[in-house]
Amino acid sequence: MTEQEPPAPLGESGSVQPAGAEGVASPWLTGPVGGVSAASFFSDTGHEMTTAVLPSFLTATLHASASALGLVEGISDGLMGLAKLGTGPLANEPHRRSRFASGGYLGTAIATGLIGVSVAVWQVGIFRALAWIARGVRSPARDSILASLVSPLAYGRAFGLERAGDNLGAVAGPLLAAGLITSIGIRPTLYLAVIPGLFAVVAITVAARSARQSLPTAGGAMRIEFGRIRRAGLLRPMVPVAAFELGNVATTLLILRATQQLQSGGLTVTAAASFAILIYAVHNAFGAAVAAVGGHWVDRSGPRIVFATAAGLYVVAYIGFALPGQGWPTLLVAFTLAGSGIGLAETAESTLVARALPDELRGSGFGLLGGVQAAGDFASSAVVGLLYAVLSPVVGFAYAAGWMLVALLGASQLRATQEEGAGN
């Protein structure tokens, strides 16, 4: 670690312990921290409006299959991961982060809105991929900005708040979509998704300006320094993180499963789609609440137990999605468990990176994390979508649950590596 960002000591439980009076008294909930969370809220509102409508748009309007939906999501996730991995080192330099964050949020907003003009599946795939590439460009920069704004004692709470904002946007987006598609139709709803994204650009620009003023101009190398990242103890925990992401089914497939289950229960296509979107909003509401609470939990107990709990919740959730002939109560429980799981997992993973690395390496670290996440998401979306369409939804969700079990068993790597990283 450098003198610029000294490591906080770790207790036996893996939680960060007070390093001194200054660290204890330092406030963490500031305007810039709130601005980062607001950017996540507005951006997620926009692209989750599209995510909620996409299954019906592809399958009902463009007459595509579940495998096409999985392929679109999988390719987009894969490209987002490459963008995170490639641009993460560029975010090592504090004064470059603002441009990458603002530009990424702007690109996400514009490309998401353009999905509405698509008349073929390949066009949806292109615009979705462009939006997700922009998300990949912005993410390491945003996370590095956020880590630079708070004390190491408050990393969990800060990232929990950011994840809460993200998930609250994922509540507002589906709710807006559910109301808009019944009044103005699917395509106009897709067009309007650009508006919240533009608010996100303003919010992240203001937050980044504050972070830029508080850090020196000099930054880290413009490449991923795997040697330093390995010595910081961050490579081994990527194994259970990868297993988790290999089991992290795209939310569009969860919405599709709910829609089909509700249709089999007697609802029309439109009614089933609207109801499924509303249940998905509950998923995201729990994700927001649990992320905020989970951030405090991570600061007290460390990422390991929080991550393991997330994987366990997903195993149970996938059982609910796999069971055939289920009505809305079972689907609601399954969505709630999955939402809680993602709220805990993302907070734990981001906190792990922020604790392990100094500021001049965090862009690379967050890029590496994002690359692992997106590579796993690509494989999960593609494979589960194929199994879903060719064999059965039961097989697809059983496959995903198996990977979550692997992540649960491998969660011990997060604690061991965290302790090693503290000594560097």
Regions found by a protein language model. Name each.
Residues 77-85, 170-171, 284-292, 377-378:
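Residue-level signature of mid-helix packing/kink "hotspots" within the transmembrane helices
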Residues 93-105, 299-311:
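Cytoplasmic membrane-interface "Motif A"-like loop-to-helix N-cap segments
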Residues 83-96, 181, 289-302, 388:
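Helix-to-loop junctions at the C-terminal end of transmembrane segments
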Residues 23-77, 235-265, 269-272, 276:
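Helix-loop boundary and gating motifs at the non-cytosolic
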Residues 188-205, 396-412:
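Symmetry-related core transmembrane helices of the 12-TM Major Facilitator Superfamily/SLC fold
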Residues 5-30, 209-240:
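Juxtamembrane intracellular "pre-TM" segments in multi-pass secondary transporters
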Residues 106-119, 312-326:
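C-terminal ends and interior cores of transmembrane alpha-helices
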Residues 137-150, 344-357:
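Intracellular juxtamembrane helix-capping segments at the cytosolic ends
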